[in-house]
């Protein structure tokens, strides 16, 4: 049994040249039982539309085998209305694309789990967390309910955590730091979206307990 990851840069495999940036599935290893493989097909900057149009989903589908489990998480780039190659409407093409992936995987005997987008590290002047993903998390929630597919509400989980901890403490999770900390980024980084290694570990600590509650996914984990 393998775990297949379909998504954007928050899930993408990162190498030494972008350290400390990581996609959160890179930190799943310690939680998994022996023999469980992780195949990460996620790609930076992709929406459901561009992921399908570029054939990236098809690459993963070809590798999928009966009994595998797919984690699907898009939304950060679907909202980019200025880019017709990526933009989708929340309750239209976004839901249609997600359902299309789920249906195609199901035909190969693969069960899917949807995950809403991770909250961005952006705050209002009063210190409250900004809403930065529009209707996409809710659109995914409604789709999951409609077609009876399990959902991990990562948007809600991360928003709750970030809202209950100090901004300075939360900063350590994101690629948001000053100069001279990492050789790859001598001038620092002002990134409110992507995860550092510690952030990837944090996301796994939120995701894994939720996945264990899903009967068909629980056997993946120690």
Residue ranges and their predicted role:
Residues 2-6, 41-46, 130-140:
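Short, charged N-terminal helix-start/capping segments
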Residues 9, 47, 77:
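Gly/Ser/Thr-rich beta-alpha loop segments that engage phosphate groups in nucleotides
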Residues 11, 33, 52, 194-196:
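Generic, ordered loop/turn and secondary-structure boundary motif
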Residues 13, 48-49, 80:
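Glycine/Thr-rich phosphate-binding loops of Rossmann-like dinucleotide-binding domains
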Residues 47-55:
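Structural motif
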Residues 55-201, 205-222:
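Alpha-helical cap/lid subdomain in secreted, periplasmic
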């Amino acid at each position: 049994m393998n775990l297949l990851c379909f998504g954007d840069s928050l899930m993408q495999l990162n190498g030494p040249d972008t350290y400390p940036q990581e996609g959160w599935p890179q930190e799943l290893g310690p939680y998994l039982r022996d023999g469980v493989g992780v195949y990460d097909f996620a790609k930076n900057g992709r929406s459901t539309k561009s992921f399908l149009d570029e054939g990236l989903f098809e690459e993963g589908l070809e590798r999928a085998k009966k009994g595998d489990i797919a984690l699907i998480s898009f939304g950060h780039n679907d909202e980019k209305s200025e880019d017709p190659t990526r933009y989708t409407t929340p309750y239209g093409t976004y839901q249609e694309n997600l359902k299309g992936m789920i249906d195609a995987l199901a035909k190969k005997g693969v069960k899917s789990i949807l995950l809403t987008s991770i909250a961005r590290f952006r705050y209002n002047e009063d210190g409250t967390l900004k809403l930065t993903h529009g209707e996409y998390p809710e659109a995914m929630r409604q789709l999951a309910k409609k077609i009876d597919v399990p959902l991990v509400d990562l948007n809600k989980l991360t928003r709750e955590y970030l809202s209950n901890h100090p901004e300075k403490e939360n900063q350590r999770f994101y690629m948001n730091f000053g100069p001279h900390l990492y050789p790859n980024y001598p001038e620092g980084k002002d990134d409110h979206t992507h995860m550092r290694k510690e952030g990837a570990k944090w996301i796994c600590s939120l995701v894994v307990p939720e996945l264990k509650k899903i009967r068909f996914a629980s056997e993946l984990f120690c």
